[in-house]
Amino acid sequence: MSTIKIKQVKSRIGAPADQKRTLDALGLRKLNRVVEHESTPSILGMVDKVKHLVAIVK
């Protein structure tokens, strides 16, 4: 499976608790941090849940 790089581009301040937990589960705790994950359905679902806070880096 391929990997994707995910970057947090917006602050988590003011976001609902479930979105904050999703960012934590992805390993994104600070702004402009990039993490790399396998492109599995569960990871893609988490990215979709916080798509307004993150960006996919090529």
Curated annotation (Swiss-Prot):
Example of a GO MF term: structural constituent of ribosome
Keyword presence, rRNA-binding: no
Keywords in alphabetical order: Ribonucleoprotein, Ribosomal protein
Cross-referenced Gene3D superfamilies: Ribosomal protein L30, ferredoxin-like fold domain
Entries under Pfam families matching the protein: Ribosomal_L30 (PF00327)
Subunit and partners: Part of the 50S ribosomal subunit.
Protein name: Large ribosomal subunit protein uL30
Organism: Bacteroides fragilis (strain ATCC 25285 / DSM 2151 / CCUG 4856 / JCM 11019 / LMG 10263 / NCTC 9343 / Onslow / VPI 2553 / EN-2)
Upper taxonomic lineage: Bacteria, Pseudomonadati, Bacteroidota, Bacteroidia, Bacteroidales
